[in-house]
Swiss-Prot record:
This is Probable ubiquitin carboxyl-terminal hydrolase creB. The active site is at C58, H413. The lineage of its organism: Eukaryota, Fungi, Dikarya, Ascomycota, Pezizomycotina. Residues 574-641 form a coiled coil. It catalyses: Thiol-dependent hydrolysis of ester, thioester, amide, peptide and isopeptide bonds formed by the C-terminal Gly of ubiquitin (a 76-residue protein attached to proteins as an intracellular targeting signal). It comes from Aspergillus fumigatus (strain CBS 144.89 / FGSC A1163 / CEA10) (Neosartorya fumigata). GO terms for cellular component: cytosol; nucleus. The gene is creB.
Amino acid sequence: MFCLLLGSTAPSVGAVPAKKEPQPPPMTPLEKRLLDMGPIREDGSDKFYGMENYGNTCYCNSILQCLYYSVPFREAVINYPTRTPIESLEAALAKSLRYPNPNAQLEAEAQAEKQKAANAQRPGMPPNPQQKPEDKDSPEYKKKMALQTLPLLETQNNASSYGMSESLFTSLKDIFESVVGSQSRIGIIRPQQFLEVLRRDHEMFRTAMHQDAHEFLNLLLNEVVANVEAEASKQPPIEKSLPAPETADSVDQSSSTGSKTPNTTRWVHELFEGLLTSETQCLTCEKVSQRDEVFLDLSVDLEQHSSVTSCLRKFSAEEMLCERNKFHCDNCGGLQEAEKRMKIKRLPRILALHLKRFKYTEDLQRLQKLFHRVVYPYHLRLFNTTDDAEDPDRLYELYAVVVHIGGGPYHGHYVAIIKTEDRGWLLFDDEMVEPVDKNYVKNFFGDKPGLACAYVLFYQETTLEAVLKEQEQENMDSNLAATDANDTILKQNGFPQSPLAHVHSASQIPSHEDNLRPNGLRRAPTAPQLSTHHEHGDPESAPFSPLSPLSPLSQTPPVPPVPERVTTVATPPKNDALAKKERAREEKERKAAEKEREKAEKLRRKEQEARMKENQRREEAELKAALEMSKASKAEEDRRLSHENGKEKQGGSLSRLKRGSKSLSHRLGKDKETRSVSSDLPPVPIPEHSTLSQTGPTSEQQQQQQQQQQQQQSPPNHDQPPNSPQLGKPTIREDEQVNHKDSKHERTGHGKWRSFSLRKKSFSILS
C-alpha cells in the first residue's frame, strides 16, 4: 500500500513487465563496407569468412586466408579434377551451414544483467571489485560476438565425390568450395576436418604447441603437389588425355594459368615455382659452372634498417669460396678458389618472400627474433635475374602479409592482412575480419612499438596499366573524401564554420572530471600504440574526435566563410576530368621515360662492370705472368749457384794441393841450389867439445860466412833489380824474425825444427 502511495508510475505486484522487442546487433565495419555490393558472385571473390581457432591454429588460418585470396590458386584448386556442380554444393551446404540465434546477443546481455542483479541483492555479499565490464573494442570481444552472431560453416569430407582419396588437398578443396558456394558473404569457417587430416599425416602438428607459418606454407604446397601427382598417376593414360567437363570459367582460368587442360598437375609449379641458378666461377681457369634448383618461396636474410630490395641484393651477392670452403673445379682437377652467386632464372607468378626473423644465436643457444626494420614496397620488380631469364621485367604487387606478433619463435600469434579485389585491405584475425586502411600495412616494418613484424610477404604479378589505373582510382577516392569532409563542416542552415572554431567549441565543454582536476597541461600521446582492432577500423564506426589526427578536419585546410566558395568546392569544374586524364597521361609518359632511363642505366652499369672485370682479368693475367717469370728466373739462379758451389767443392782440395806442391817444389829447388853452391867451399872443422847450446850461434855465423863467400863467388843476377836485396842475403828484419822464431820455438819446447836445421847444415858442410 505504501508503494502505491509513492507514485502512480510504480508497477503493481502482479503486473508483468513488457517484453523487449529483439533488436538486431549493431553493424560491424565490414558489414557497413559491404552494403553497396550487388548480387553474390559465383567465383567467391566477394566472400569474407573468418576461421575458428582450435588452440594455437592461427598459423594455419592466416596461410589459408592468403591462399584463398590468390585468385589463380583458388580457381585451380576448385577446378581440379572437376568442379562440383553448384546444385549439389548448395544441397551439401544446407546441411553444414548453421545460422546462430539472432537473439543470442540479447539473451547473453540479459543473462549478465540478471546475474549482476542477483549478486547485488545478496545480503552480506560485497560486490566483486575485480569484475570489470568487457571492452567492446577488444579483439576477444569481437571474436566472441562473431561466433554468436555470424553463420558457422562446417566442412565435410567430400573426397569421394572428387574421385580421390582423402588428403590435405581434398580438405583444402572442401574449404574453398564451401566458401564459394555459400549464400552469405560473411561468416566463420570451422576447419576442423582439415586440421584432423593435417595431424593424422604429420606428427609435428599433433600437439598444441606454437607452429611456424612459413614451415606450414612450404609443407602445404609440397603436399598439394604430391597429392595431385599421386592421384594423376593412378588414372589411365586415356582418361588423363581427355579433358573433363568443366564450366566456361574454369576453362578460361585454366588457360590463363598456362595449362593446356583443366586437370593438369602442373598448376602448382606454374604459380609458385621459380628457378634459381647457382653460378660458380673458378678464379684459376675462369670457367663458369651453373647448377639449377627450383624453389616455392624465397627466404632472405635480414639486416637492420634495410629493405626487401637490399635483402634480395644481398641474396644474389658474390660469395668468395676459399680456405676450407674451396670449390672443386672439374677443369683444373682440384680444389680452387672461386666466386659464387645466386640468380633467378625463371620468375614465379606468385612470389612468396620469407623474411628470416628468427636467427639462432650461439650465446643464448636458441632461436631469437630479430626486430629489424625492413621496408617492403607495394610494387616490386626483381633485378637479380640472369641474362637469359624469362620476362625479367615482371612487375609484382603486394597482396597479402602474414604478421607475427610475439617476442620469440616459440610463442605468439599470427594474423593476415590481405588486399581483396574491390574492397581494399582487410585484417583477418581468426574469427574477426575488419577493413583497414592501405597505410595500415606499413605498420609492420619492425620498428613500431609492439611485437608485430611482417613475416611472409605474398606478391602476385601485375601490369603497369593496372598499377596506373589503381593509382588514379585512389586519387579520385581521396578527392571525394576531401569533398565529403568539407561538406561536414557546413552547418545545418547552410553557412560554413571554421574548423578551428569547431575545435574550440568542442574543447570548451567542461566535464565533471575537469572540474575536479587542477588546471594544467594535459599529456597527449605522440605516437599511438599499435593494435589490431579499433585503432585501424572503419572511420565511420569510430566516434568523432576533433583532436584526433585521423579526423578529416585536421587533414583539410580551413574554408573561408563565403557561401559561394563552398558551392565551388562541392561541385568541381568539368575540366577536372580532362586534367586528371592529362595528369595520368603525363604520369604514364614519365613512368615510361623513367623505365627507359633505368634500362639505359642498367645497360651502362653492365658495360661498366664488364670493363672492370676485363681490366681486372688483364691485371691478374699480367700479375700472374710476372710471378711466373720471377719464379723461373729465381729457379735459374738457384740452379746456377748450386752448379758453381758444386764445382768449387769438387776442385777446392786439388787447387790447394797444387799450390802446396808448387811452393814445396820451389823450396826444394832453392835447397838444391844451396847445396850445390856450398859443395864448392872447403870443409870447416867442428869442435867436438861444443855443446848444443854453443853450436846454435856458431853454425849461424858459419852459415852467414858461407852465404857471403857464395855471393862473392857467384855471378851477379841481372834479372834482379839493382835496389832489391839479394836472395841469399837475409835482411835485418828477416834475421830478427828467424831469431825470434828460434827463440819462440825454444821457449815453447818445440826444438825439432831447430835440430832439423842444424842437421841440414851439418850435412851441407860435410858434403
